[in-house]
Regions:
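Conserved catalytic cores of very large enzyme subunits
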Residues: 1-79, 109, 113-116, 120-336
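Extended non-globular scaffold/tether segments
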Residues: 78-89
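Amphipathic, well-ordered alpha-helical segments in soluble domains
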Residues: 90-97, 160-163
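A conserved hydrophobic secondary-structure block that centers on an alpha-helix together
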Residues: 101-109
């Protein structure tokens, strides 16, 4: 009745024995979704579910159910549309709940906050984000839906400083947002990232208790032209990790010695010095070269991000997974 049951039937007896005694852990990808990807967050923020559904309909118009191979494509696209509707619906449910709470809220300041939340969730993720606040909300509702559907670790927001910066810049210039308010929003987002958890089977829960979600956020590096991509949001992201100091999100930096400023390196060092284990420090040029060696065009390779724990990844284009079985070396010594 499930993928897991199919996997159990095919699992050799010796492997099941080693798993049951704690010597080998092989359940992870059989009991949940795959993860290990950066799932098109920038597109969701820019287009909203409406834009994505419009693209689905455009492709559907080119297909013919009588043409070999098209039936499967049609069913797949209809499933995508259904998922998009579900993501939009969750946003509207949050909006309705915020309005309900606002009606019963005696504190005027909090009531206004709740109404602002309602207005934000009415807009996103169904429609394109218009502000920094809406962009963050759109991304996080989408993230929540991914976990609801997949129940897997390592769904990576990726290069947040790149896709959030245009909204931040526009809001700052229009006077809608201050740097302090933007920092608070990111700090709150960091807290929400740490709320995500998985539903585990007994073996997985015992073997990987405390296993984090590896939601890898990346900042720094270069843009699609190979130029310095560090911006104000890059520093705000580093500061969020410094201020919140929770185990999620996993923060990585791409540092390009030839392109990124020394002030960025100094900020990275200040955060590392706190002892939280973040950010992970990645040589940007090596990451680019790894993708070039896979045949990825240079313009696309410039946009790589560390994924999970950790693989080089391209947003919306790759799923990378480098470890399936975990071996307990201590048990090998004990058995010997």
């Amino acid at each position: 009745r499930s993928t897991y049951e199919q996997w159990l039937v095919q699992c050799p007896d010796f492997a099941a024995t080693l798993r049951d005694c704690g010597a080998l852990y092989i359940n992870r990808k059989s009991v949940r979704g795959w993860g290990e990807t950066t799932a098109g967050y920038s597109r969701v923020i820019k287009e909203g579910m409406e834009g994505i559904k419009a693209h689905i309909h455009k492709v559907l118009d080119t297909l013919d159910i009588t043409r070999p191979g098209d039936y499967e494509k049609i069913e797949y696209l209809k499933a995508m549309e259904l998922a998009a509707d579900g993501i939009s619906a969750l946003g509207h449910r949050y909006a309705a709940e915020a309005r309900k709470l606002a009606e019963a809220e005696p504190d005027e300041k909090r009531r206004k906050e709740l109404l602002q939340i309602a207005g934000t969730c009415d807009q996103v993720p169904e429609k394109p984000a218009r502000t920094f606040r809406e962009a963050i909300q759109s991304m996080y509702i989408y993230q929540t839906c991914i976990f609801m559907e997949q129940n897997a670790a390592s769904y990576n927001p990726g290069r947040m400083d790149q896709y959030l910066y245009p909204f931040y810049k526009a809001d700052i210039e229009a006077g809608r947002l201050t740097e302090e308010e933007a920092q608070e929003l990111l700090d709150c987002l960091w807290v929400k990232f740490s709320e995500q958890c998985l539903f585990q089977d007994q073996v997985t829960a015992q073997f990987s208790a405390g296993y984090p979600m590896f939601q890898n956020v990346c900042c720094g590096g270069v843009d699609e032209r190979g130029m310095d991509a560090v911006n104000d949001v890059s520093y705000l992201i580093l500061q969020a990790t410094a201020e919140v100091q929770l185990y999620q999100p996993s923060l990585s930096v791409r540092y390009n010695m030839a392109k990124n400023p020394s002030s960025f390196l100094k900020k990275i060092a200040e955060v590392i010095k706190l002892g939280t284990g973040f950010p992970a420090f990645h040589n940007d040029e090596v990451g680019i070269e790894m993708l070039l060696n896979k045949g990825i065009p240079l313009k696309e390779a410039y946009n790589w991000n560390p994924c999970g724990c950790v693989e080089t990844n391209l947003e919306g284009k790759q799923r990378c997974y480098t470890a399936y079985a975990d071996f307990n070396l201590g048990s090998a010594v004990e058995f010997a």
